[in-house]
UniProtKB/Swiss-Prot annotation:
The gene is xlnD. It comes from Aspergillus flavus (strain ATCC 200026 / FGSC A1120 / IAM 13836 / NRRL 3357 / JCM 12722 / SRRC 167). This is Probable exo-1,4-beta-xylosidase xlnD. Residues 1-20 form the signal peptide. Its EC number is 3.2.1.37. Glycans are attached at residues 23, 87, 142, 237, 326, 391, 404, 442, 479, 521, 617, 644, 657, 684, 706. Pathway: Glycan degradation; xylan degradation. It catalyses: Hydrolysis of (1->4)-beta-D-xylans, to remove successive D-xylose residues from the non-reducing termini. The active site is at D310. Gene3D superfamilies: Glycoside hydrolase family 3 C-terminal domain, Glycoside hydrolase, family 3, N-terminal domain, Immunoglobulins.
């Protein structure tokens, strides 16, 4: 089994570096890493279950499964001395040996597979399935796939937990939006759309991890992160640890938080992570408006759900934010604002001082620890061996359909950007020898992105093609940003000249985009583009694979007629090489679509990444497909097929879909099965899709709404739904139904309220607007969601 880099080692190297990044837009705080933080904070997960059969806790209320989770947790916490209480306020909880409470590690990772676990060196528990990164999975436009992946991750996580190698909660999913293309962690997200994509991903992932909505017991505890307004690492020396992001109420409500509303209200996530950055002057982890007014009072966060600080974020409230006068006050401000658990050591190292200075009370600490243990109780932590999920073992990891699903997810996620007809390759063609060139040609762990555990196997493109019917010649040609030696490109050209067809596998990787590292530009690395141009000049058939999570400006390749095909492969996971080879050779047909905009390079050169305003103004050309006023290289939602599809309004759609709706009547309807009337479909956008080509293929679609209703400026369009039809045979047709909810038609006003405006609306199929359904909303405008007044309940100390 190919080895994978230890996530612990990666994070240990990464996080202190991140803490040391200076923020040149602020006072020079001379930021240094908290010297006490990482040795304890980074301990890998794993714990034993409390003994509720014969241990000291067995006769207490916490082991009484008939009692309410809150009461059980409160009873446990009441048994702790103040010192024991303090020692359980961080991610590395010490437990309380005196009463038989084991130590517990809150920090476990599950971004696209089990990670930050206590993996064995070989044999059982030595690996976990590594699925594609979320940016790739979302491109498949298959919500069922997201749920299936999360379900398998939770099964594997439970097996590790039952073996004492993992915890019951995970620091996933990352549901921030990929707003600016330079962001290093965009690969971890579902793309640039908040209302539809990020919210759908949040719902499907969280319910898959937790075992459903209102699951009892919870399978695992998901953590929605990073709340809120976090989408920059170190762009232009603006450190994520000290950034104060200026966000209007309108943008905060419309773009930076709706996915957290869905995660809390609809998916019933049991944990939320507050982010490093500040918003409008207040660090997120000491922001009572975020953590109490919005999350608990407005977003309907579950009772006793807990908030964890990002790792070191409580310390950052003091340094570099300077919001608190010292680390002790930073800890006090954060716990009182609503950060229940500190991923770090500011809480356990400083609460004695905070308590002595009367900045916190025992009740403040008890509230946070009670919330953590109430969630663990809901996950069966104190329920004994007969509790559901306690019988999941390594055999369940091995026997799940995980490896097949990992391949399926990779194959479904690959986007065909350009094709002049060269693809798919066929065995009847004259192509016998393929030159495989580039820094991704023999990629292994490179395909996993970040936050991964050791995979059971890694299939590179080279390995996959070597197992095909083609003769493969391989040379790297160039690395990601530099040539390995002075002759590497000339060697690649010689190899290419002797082949019938060339595949260049390149793009960007975690040497350019990752946590704590943004890109400085969105161009192809010059060394790679130079080699691609030389390969194109040979006049041989040339296929280019653009890999990595963030987009690069591929206009030179799009416009070069000697580049016959261009594929975006993202981070496709452990089976990525096989999926790419199968797409190229026609064993699978591409159907994915971009979930980010591919901007021209000038966009990142002239528009600062710290400008959080979505709407165009002055030098701001507008951000995301909703507001961008320029011409993208490839649009959000772009993706080609190997076959031809036609789409038409479904027969009878004119009667099924009314063309006029009165707002008062719509909002006055009964809504059985829905918590809120605005969650109901106003109409079903129904289209018939026919495969008029000669290849079986999946079909994906996005439904966009546009309107001039409400105040200017008006968005270009916005996404209200998507779907994927599987295996549409040549000559056959299938019907696609995309519900368009009442809420999806609302816009956000300057106060942050979601408002349904009267006027003319259109729902259109894909960017090409193959099918357009027009309708009118009549009557008076109506506020569907009232944004609360922004004020801090807790003053800084």
């Amino acid at each position: 089994m190919p080895g994978a880099a230890s996530i612990v080692a990666v994070l240990a190297a990464l996080l202190p570096t991140a803490l040391g990044q200076a923020n040149q837009s602020y006072v020079d705080y001379n930021i240094e890493a908290n010297p006490d933080l990482f040795s304890e904070c980074l301990e890998t997960g794993g714990t034993s279950f409390p003994d509720c059969e014969s241990g000291p806790l067995s006769k207490t209320l916490v082991c009484d499964t008939s009692a309410k989770p809150h009461d059980r947790a409160a009873a446990l916490v009441s048994l702790l001395t103040f010192e024991e209480l303090v020692n359980n306020t961080a991610n590395t909880g010490h437990g309380a040996p005196r009463i038989g409470l084991p130590a517990y590690q809150v920090w476990n990772e599950a971004l696209h597979g089990v990670a930050h676990a206590d993996f064995s060196d070989a044999g059982d528990f030595s690996w976990s399935t590594s699925f594609p990164q979320p940016i790739s999975t979302m491109a498949a436009l298959n919500r069922t796939l997201i749920h299936q992946i999360a379900t398998i991750i939770s099964t594997q996580g439970r097996a590790f937990m039952n073996a004492g190698r993992y915890g019951l909660d995970v620091y996933s999913p990352n549901i921030n939006t990929f707003r600016h293309p330079v962001w290093g962690r965009g690969q971890e997200t579902p793309g640039e759309d908040a209302y539809c994509l990020a919210s759908t991903y949040a719902y499907e992932y969280i319910t898959g991890i937790q075992g459903g909505v209102d699951a009892n017991p919870l399978k695992l505890i998901a953590t929605a992160k990073h709340y809120a307004g976090y989408d920059i690492e170190n762009w232009d020396n603006h450190s994520r640890l000290g950034n104060d992001m200026q966000i209007t109420q309108q943008d905060l409500a419309e773009y930076y938080t709706p996915q957290f509303l869905v995660a809390s209200r609809d998916a019933k996530v049991h944990s939320v992570m507050c982010s490093y950055n500040a918003v409008n002057g207040v660090p997120s982890c000491s922001n009572s408006f975020f953590l109490q007014t919005l999350l608990r009072d407005t977003f309907d966060f579950v009772e006793d759900g807990y908030v964890s600080g990002d790792c070191g974020a409580v310390y950052n409230v003091f340094n570099p934010h300077g919001y608190a006068t010292n680390e002790s006050s930073a800890a006090a401000d954060s716990i009182r604002a609503g950060t229940d658990i500190d991923c770090g050591v500011s809480y356990p190292r400083h609460f004695q001082e905070s308590f002595h200075d009367q900045e916190v009370s025992r009740q403040d600490l008890e509230r946070g620890v009670t919330r953590l243990y109430a969630s663990l109780i809901r996950a069966g932590y104190f329920d004994g061996k007969t509790s559901p999920y306690r019988n999941i073992t390594w055999s369940d990891v091995v026997s799940t359909n995980a490896q097949n699903l990992s391949y399926e997810a990779a194959a479904q996620s690959i986007v065909l950007l350009k094709n002049d007809g060269i693809l798919p390759l066929t065995t009847s063609s004259s192509t016998k020898t393929i030159a495989l060139i580039g820094p991704w040609a023999n990629a292994t762990t490179q395909m996993l992105g970040n936050y991964y555990g050791p995979a059971p196997y890694l299939i590179s493109p080279l390995q996959a093609f070597q197992d095909s019917e083609y003769k493969i010649t391989y040379t790297i040609g160039t690395n990601t940003t530099t040539d390995p030696d002075s002759t590497s490109q000339s060697t690649a050209l010689t190899t290419a000249k002797e082949a019938d067809l060339i595949i260049f596998a390149g793009g960007i990787d975690n040497t350019l985009e990752t946590e704590a590292q943004d890109r400085s530009n969105i161009t192809w690395p010059s060394n790679q583009l130079s080699l691609i141009t030389k390969l194109a000049d040979l006049g041989k058939p040339l296929i280019v694979l653009q890999m990595g999570g963030g987009q690069v400006d591929s206009s030179a390749l799009k416009n070069n007629k000697n580049v016959n095909a261009l594929i975006w492969g993202g981070y496709p996971g452990q089976s990525g090489g096989q999926a790419l080879a199968d797409i190229i050779t026609g064993k699978r047909a591409p159907a994915a679509r971009l979930v980010t905009t591919q901007y021209p390079a000038e966009y990142a050169e002239v528009f600062p990444a710290i400008d959080m305003n979505l709407r165009p103004n002055g030098s701001n050309p507008g951000q995301t497909y909703m507001w961008y006023t320029g011409t993208p290289v490839y649009e959000f939602g772009h993706g080609l097929f190997y076959t031809n599809f036609t789409a038409s309004a479904s027969a009878g759609s004119g009667t099924k879909n009314r063309t006029s709706f009165n707002i008062d009547e719509v909002l006055g309807r009964p809504h059985p099965g829905y918590k809120l009337v605005e969650q109901m479909p106003l109409l079903n956008f129904t289209v018939d899709v026919k495969n008029t080509g000669d290849r079986v293929s999946d079909y994906t679609a996005m439904a966009f709404v546009n309107t001039t209703a409400g105040p200017a400026p008006h968005p270009n369009k916005w996404l209200v739904g998507f779907d994927r039809l599987s295996a549409v045979e040549p000559g056959s047709a299938k019907t696609m139904v995309i519900p368009v909810t009442v809420d999806s038609l609302a816009r956000t006003d300057e106060e942050g309220n979601r408002v349904l405006y009267p006027g003319r609306y259109e729902v259109a199929l894909n960017n090409e607007r193959e099918v357009v359904l027009g309708f009118t909303l009549t009557g008076e405008k109506a506020v569907l969601f009232k944004w609360p007044k922004e004020e801090q309940l807790i003053a800084p100390q």
